[in-house]
């Protein structure tokens, strides 16, 4: 603080307070009355424009959907920082100018200094955040949405204000806040601590200026390099340049307005004896008034250079002429905002539910299939025991290879013509050992009618060592309206006769093809099954589900015959039981 002669010291209108006599002996400013009146009017205009303009900026960002982005969130935060000085310090400054000094308490002086520091430091930090946001938007556009998402932007905003508070609080203990009659306000006095003064100025002013200058330099280089590219919309390019220029002008105005105050502060702190008497009082007053005037310039710059802000300003001015309409529109906008957020959350929940349902439906086929069906071993399966891939060459199927077991009610006719039902239950696949190496089948164009097929044969002997004959689908006859998947298992007996002769099956009707030798599969069994020449078989396939618990066959053991079935779409092996009364063998089959 500059020293003044004793003759300039005199009593003021200050009165004693509980915090001490503030301003009992202060230097009288040597300003002419006209200058004081001019400064008073300028500060009144500054306060009014500051409050109205920054309020309109906040309303514009809140109401206009085009202005609701991460960059303008920092613009609204900058407006809040500018409004702080217009709410508390500037009115007290006007009061001090009107009464000719400070006659308020020391606590109010401390609060004025604290709020002023928060406003100034908050403004420069928000300008730095705006510059970084513009830099990421133009120079790193691919990562912009990830870096400045809504959640991240809110975090950056909180961090900005936390850094502002941490930067100002040390001044409350290290630097002393005193009333300066040259500026009619309470400021930080760093005369007794020059090192701390230089550090504060570098952190609060110089370092942010370097960061902002670097960001805008890179942005300008990027804009010049991308001028008039092929396929670029000129309107969009012009809008980006205007937006960049708006933020750059805001930065320049802040630097120009606050640079004189910071320079004077550093000079007085470093060389107080030389500079104290050389700096006139009016220069201090002009420097601080220019700095204070910066708080109302930002809203004006937005309205001049940004078309979206300008349109919103006109809307707000029109609404101010009709307060009821303005309040109604404001309530409607708030309701629409909440409804939009609720709808967004509902859409997110619905999308998550649809994804969960799709995942559940994707696994329902496997989860709903019995384990004994899912573990059916097909010929050529690599996990089958004792398998020989070389001997099994099944033809690739055009349909799904998964086996779905359909129920089959097989009615057998005896020689006398009376039907005798044979109940067939499937056995678990774990009790049957299959050896696909001995099963050979070749598809043939043999058509088979379920209830009118007659077989002629004298002695047909089969030899099998506990084989699994699997079929995927059969082509149904007149009594069946859809193809059915079946799997047959032959459980070996105790006798092991050798193979004698094999008679080829010939259909009795002339409407069916005759099976040739290459069409018959060779199935070896460990017991002898004989089929009479007069056996009449009729197959009736139903659509009910097969029971999973095995049950016994009829009293008379059946003859098991392996018949290859081949149609235009399905080529499978089907096991058919012929219940003959004179058979001596007992067998269990799982279909």
From Swiss-Prot:
Keyword Transmembrane helix (UniProt): yes
Induction: Expression in the brain is highly responsive to energy status being decreased by both fasting and high fat diet feeding. Induced by TGFB.
Membrane-spanning intervals of the chain: 39-59, 73-93, 112-132, 152-172, 197-217, 248-268, 282-302
UniProt keyword annotations, A-Z: Cell membrane, Disulfide bond, G-protein coupled receptor, Membrane, Receptor, Synapse, Transducer, Transmembrane, Transmembrane helix
Stored PROSITE patterns: G_PROTEIN_RECEP_F1_1, G_PROTEIN_RECEP_F1_2
PANTHER family linked: B2 BRADYKININ RECEPTOR/ANGIOTENSIN II RECEPTOR, MELATONIN-RELATED RECEPTOR
Lineage top rank: taxon: Eukaryota
Stored SUPFAM superfamilies: Family A G protein-coupled receptor-like
Function: G protein-coupled receptor that plays a role in numerous physiological processes including regulation of energy metabolism, neurite outgrowth or cell migration. Promotes self-renewal and neuronal differentiation of neural progenitor cells through activation of the NOTCH and WNT/beta-catenin signaling pathways. Modulates the KAT5-dependent glucocorticoid receptor signaling by modulating KAT5 subcellular compartmentalisation.
A GO term, aspect molecular function: melatonin receptor activity
Mode of membrane association: Multi-pass membrane protein
Family: Belongs to the G-protein coupled receptor 1 family.
Disulfide cross-links: 109-186
Annotated tissue distribution: Strongly expressed in the brain with highly restricted pattern of expression, confined to a subset of the ependymal cells of the third ventricle and a population of cells in the dorsomedial hypothalamic nucleus.
Stretches assigned to the Cytoplasmic side: 60-72, 133-151, 218-247, 303-591
Membrane topology (Extracellular): 1-38, 94-111, 173-196, 269-281
Protein name stated in the entry: Melatonin-related receptor
Oligomeric and partner information: Homodimer, and heterodimer with MTNR1A and MTNR1B. Interacts with KAT5. Interacts with RTN4 isoform A/NOGO-A. Interacts with TGFBR1.
Species of origin: Mus musculus (Mouse)
Region spans: Disordered: 378-427
GO annotation, cellular component aspect: nucleoplasm; plasma membrane; postsynaptic density
Annotated knockout phenotype: GPR50-deletion mice exhibit significantly lower body weights in the weeks following weaning and by 10 weeks of age are significantly lighter than wild type mice. This is due in part by an increased metabolic rate. In addition, glucocorticoid receptor signaling is significantly diminished in mice lacking GPR50.
Gene: Gpr50
